Amino acid sequence: MNILLVSQCEKRALSETRRILDQFAERRGERTWQTPITQAGLDTLRRLLKKSARRNTAVACHWIRGRDHSELLWIVGDASRFNAQGAVPTNRTCRDILRKEDENDWHSAEDIRLLTVMAALFHDIGKASQAFQAKLRNRGKPMADAYRHEWVSLRLFEAFVGPGSSDEDWLRRLADKRETGDAWLSQLARDDRQSAPPGPFQKSRLPPLAQAVGWLIVSHHRLPNGDHRGSASLARLPAPIQSQWCGARDADAKEKAACWQFPHGLPFASAHWRARTALCAQSMLERPGLLARGPALLHDSYVMHVSRLILMLADHHYSSLPADSRLGDPNFPLHANTDRDSGKLKQRLDEHLLGVALHSRKLAGTLPRLERQLPRLARHKGFTRRVEQPRFRWQDKAYDCAMACREQAMEHGFFGLNLASTGCGKTLANGRILYALADPQRGARFSIALGLRSLTLQTGQAYRERLGLGDDDLAILVGGSAARELFEKQQERLERSGSESAQELLAENSHVHFAGTLEDGPLREWLGRNSAGNRLLQAPILACTIDHLMPASESLRGGHQIAPLLRLMTSDLVLDEVDDFDIDDLPALSRLVHWAGLFGSRVLLSSATLPPALVQGLFEAYRSGREIFQRHRGAPGRATEIRCAWFDEFSSQSSAHGAVTSFSEAHATFVAQRLAKLEQLPPRRQAQLCTVHAAGEARPALCRELAGQMNTWMADLHRCHHTEHQGRRISFGLLRLANIEPLIELAQAILAQGAPEGLHVHLCVYHSRHPLLVRSAIERQLDELLKRSDDDAAALFARPTLAKALQASTERDHLFVVLASPVAEVGRDHDYDWAIVEPSSMRSIIQLAGRIRRHRSGFSGEANLYLLSRNIRSLEGQNPAFQRPGFETPDFPLDSHDLHDLLDPALLARIDASPRIVEPFPLFPRSRLVDLEHRRLRALMLADDPPSSLLGVPLWWQTPASLSGALQTSQPFRAGAKERCYALLPDEDDEERLHFSRYEEGTWSNQDNLLRNLDLTYGPRIQTWGTVNYREELVAMAGREDLDLRQCAMRYGEVRLRENTQGWSYHPYLGFKKYN
């Protein structure tokens, strides 16, 4: 192809880009180059330009398509030097005549700026205490203060304001520069006294505006967090906040007293600080309506949390800078911090307060412009081109529907639901929908948040391969770097073998990428030093595990919250497979959705099995947040009418809703239409209940009994659902157990028992307690064999892994069985012939059924899903039985634990999403398994008659709960038992020996005393399959990566295990099991 390159660089950037461009193209002028070039060459050129780009870089690349047509491919550097088509302006001026960039829709920007600057001027005055100053000068081990400095700062601010004062009183005193006395210090409420003084936020202690400033002061490091006693105490926030909510610790009387003594004075003695506070106070007095709005500010989530974000970011940034002698009084005796490397005193206290205030003011002006300055993806043909395959043409209708409501979504927000069935291409459709909603000239920015690491990697890979997105367009963030590297190495092996998808033509994948730059200042500098935060914020499209975004609403410590919150404020959000999260994680998920609405994001939920209560609860979370956003950023006085849309493979529709009632009606109508269409399709899965005869026995005996019954059921299922080729018959089956402990014991029993005459069983044990390297190898083999399609018999039998297994025995019938934990339900694109399931919930049954004939049509008419009538917890006599995983609790019990009593026989004839997406009326939660799930979701998500012990999700926006960390602490995200990192490490002297080791505080310690071997015996006609030898995999990986064997094990051999004082048992094929 023929390209034209235009450079608008200046200064040193011009000579640098000339040097690079001269290597690839011929000059056609002083700033113009032209050349024929391949796609690979063009990619290399762009990478080199981006690598050397600086502030004055600006290069546009045009593809000359014909005599009268050219197309802009990309811009590297400052896109403002070109227009949307890549043209260069005729004339330029440095004068900002239109002042267009100064315009924004932030009605509260000035209130936020004043609040933040005032809080910044007081945020660390508590560091003037004798205790803190002594700590700065003590080179020994750091010791926490008896009272944290931000609490002391709040008490000092409270004393200055004075009990009973109005906001006008304390602001006038502060605005009077002549007021330099400290008589007000006698009003200081010291928490070390015998009788504790009232909290600063209790009635008559602080006037309304001062309360808002005081909360910013006390929360600038972490949210106050203390005991809550249900909704009544949450509704009283912030009144209950006391010193213990803010990190006070037990200490002797002398240590406590030192926190309230100020022998070197306070920042009030600094003339520079005093002048700046007077100026800020005067500005607050002159701000029209600010004092009148004071009572509402503290309970305004948008104002308070944007102000807190600015204050935290300014504090983080300025604390990282060297001392600045230009700020504050020379020789001021108090200090705020020390140099991290040398330990010497660094910033003076008045200087620090003035510096944070200065950068708070700058950031308050930067934030409204931030969203316009970040990189976006525009005119990307991968998102806009029409689909050729009939199966996926529904995506075009979804794209058109989203594009039709673009204007309304920009003005009123967007809440969408993608309910398309599995295998219909929801992943790419989600991106197309949000791309259609974006301004076509500016382009799209969105985040795809998923619950599983494996799903995140697969989603990112799908976007890169099918849409041609590069590393600068799409960022993939997952929890573990080792897991990501293993995934990428697997993809590289596939590419070397020619298995990757064929590359599309450039014409189909070309797009404009405006590599925007953050303006100079604290935000850019802070992000420049924080590469993880930079990646999170900069990429136009982000595919990440939801853990990367959760700190936006969940983190109690401010530093962890900054980058995710900025991402949420500047991009739209896809929540993929929302109902895969545990019910205990839904409150945190709802808080994230509420904040997405609060900060102006558009939200798309994607799942085929969304229950009505979950949908209604998340819509209400979004609506309540968007309503606040509209007050501050929308047209004044206009009602909130959120544009909602529903998409599936049959239709797409949209409508506006300002209340959950009308939304719920529209959702029910769409779901009813969807079910009517689904019922016209032939069934692919049918279930059958299997009565278990093993109740009341100890688990080892129970598993032996269950293994015998499993053999019979597996043989029956194989007989009805197999693939035959050249006289041999194979089938792929899944045995799903709820928990790993009984799973391993059942695996031992099945292997010891063997298989009946005429059958050969190949058993793979798959769960999360394998070393990472082993689990990755198992998943690689499963991915290869379980990628199925119609009429794939010959290709299936020709696969090397399968052919090798068949050659090893003479039996006609071979069963390849995966015995798995719930990790098999989601995250992998596997296609089984049949399954046997230990029930936990209707949700898990439906999810697992989706793995049967996942990508194949047709159905034999015989049941291909067997459900155990009782689960193992029930057989052991435990109550509640359907929990961990499951929905049963002491507050929500079931009368029976037998599926014969809990499932309607009509459900078995056709296993699909219907029981989940339609809520029966009335509900019978004690006698029906699916009704129990709907009841629990209603109680949690809608606060519909919840038990007294349950905190309903709506409390987050119905009370001032966001002013504390109470709900984040009582309803944490992924609150499972604490896990530690272990690995099997080769001995430093004898690499044949492996040591069980634990990683703590940067070092590995030997834990061989906690590990025992797990016995394994084999019966006739059975063998393990899909399993790998840990040491062989380790040696191969170390060779490929040129790593020392021990280093390789440290990186790729980790396994995360919960605390267990009894230790662990291990077998390479079975994984880790608690020793008992």
From Swiss-Prot:
Pfam families from the UniProt entry: Cas3-like_C, Cas3-like_C_2, Cas3_HD, Cas3_I-F_Cas2
Chain sites annotated for binding Mg(2+): 124, 220
Name this protein carries in UniProt: CRISPR-associated nuclease/helicase Cas3 subtype I-F/YPEST
Lineage: Bacteria, Pseudomonadati, Pseudomonadota, Gammaproteobacteria, Pseudomonadales
Subunit structure: Interacts with Cas1.
Effect of residue 576 to A: In a disruption mutant, does not restore biofilm formation, restores crRNA production
EC number, UniProt record: 3.1.-.-, 3.6.4.-
Organism per entry: Pseudomonas aeruginosa (strain UCBPP-PA14)
PROSITE patterns named among the record's database cross-references: HD_CAS3 (PS51643)
Consequence of substituting residue 124 to A: In a disruption mutant, does not restore biofilm formation, restores crRNA production
Top-rank EC class of the record's enzyme: hydrolase
Annotated ranges, domain HD Cas3-type: 102-318
InterPro entries: Cas3-like_C, Cas3-like_dom, Cas3_I-F_Cas2, CRISPR-assoc_Cas3_HD, CRISPR-assoc_Cas3_HD_sf, CRISPR-assoc_Cas3_yers, P-loop_NTPase
Keyword entries, A-Z: Antiviral defense, ATP-binding, Helicase, Hydrolase, Magnesium, Metal-binding, Nucleotide-binding
Coiled-coil intervals: none
Free-text function comment from the UniProt entry: CRISPR (clustered regularly interspaced short palindromic repeat), is an adaptive immune system that provides protection against mobile genetic elements (viruses, transposable elements and conjugative plasmids). CRISPR clusters contain sequences complementary to antecedent mobile elements and target invading nucleic acids. CRISPR clusters are transcribed and processed into CRISPR RNA (crRNA). Cas3 plus Cascade participate in CRISPR interference, the third stage of CRISPR immunity (Potential).
Family: In the N-terminal section; belongs to the CRISPR-associated nuclease Cas3-HD family.
Any one GO MF annotation of this record: metal ion binding
Chain positions of motif DEAD box: 576-579
